[in-house]
Amino acid sequence: MQKKYDTTVLGLYVLDILGRPVSKIPEGGNLEYIDELRLTVAGTAGGTIIDCAKLGVSTLGVGAVGDDEKADFVISTLEKFGVDTIGFERLKGVPTSSTILNIRPNGERPALHLRGSCDYFLPPEKQKVDIYDCKVFHLGGTGLLKKLDGPVSVDILKEAKKRGCITTWDLIGATQETSSIVNPLLPHIDYFMPSIEEASIMCGLEEPEDIAKYYLDGGVKNCVLTMGGEGSLFLNKDNKIITPAFDINVVDTTGCGDAFDAGMIVALIKEMDIETSLKFATITSGLVATGLGSDAGIKNYDDCIDKMNSFKIKS
């Protein structure tokens, strides 16, 4: 049956304020100069959905913003990229979730985060739109979705599976305690896509394959662990695939994991084979690292395919 949307992306939507390069914070009330400053829509849902939209698939955003000027920027930016924002809630008396990122010369990104609207987000019982009318349903931001984390997220993913969606998932801010809200989700996740660091923190294991097996044993169908400059590890009951990273000039790693998620989502929509899917997700992730912000680097689908087939693999 034809679906209205290629993908629904539900979860953490954040306004990012990024500056680079920041070698130090000025002492007292002093001033330092930087070369670049940007505002972007980011977060484990926001960064992913904008990249999906840039890659040409139809998108429905589901999340929450506050009732401030930051909310206006988030919604207008999503709509500029072609995201359907009918699934958004505007919450009275709450600030929009936002992050200040000071990007170091080596691409590291220490952050100051205002939790805000995402702490209060719950999809209303009566939706303005069918959020499950999609091919791929992505839940992004577990760990920073105070009201959504836990049984509500389990019910959302169960319903997505019941409705015939492919389910994909990612988180943010993992701790050992996060496993208590993540483990009940595992049987309802088709593609589990955290970073190796986050996955390791939650399960207490260190070897990538052991980590992936832990989550497969928990019920995940396909485990994809992103490993930064080392590429990614894919594991399911039939295949183990290590995909190397591309050789790129890193400017800022903000949103690279979100871009990997977007690449996998688009690859699933396009019905690519798993090896090509992983390679495509790797190039989308790598391209984002070449500029400032979670929406940098990616131009369109064809450009990503060209770069996937022409860029050198990191040695």
Model-derived features: positions:
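A short, aliphatic-rich alpha-helical micro-motif
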Residues: 2, 130-132, 186
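A glycine-rich helix N-cap at a beta->alpha junction
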Residues: 77-94
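Conserved phosphate-binding/catalytic loop of the ribokinase/pfkB sugar-kinase fold
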Residues: 90, 101-146
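Conserved beta-alpha-beta core of the PfkB/ribokinase-like small-molecule kinase fold
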Residues: 136-213, 231-232
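Glycine-rich phosphate/adenosyl-contacting loop at the front of the ribokinase-like
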Residues: 1-64, 69-80, 251
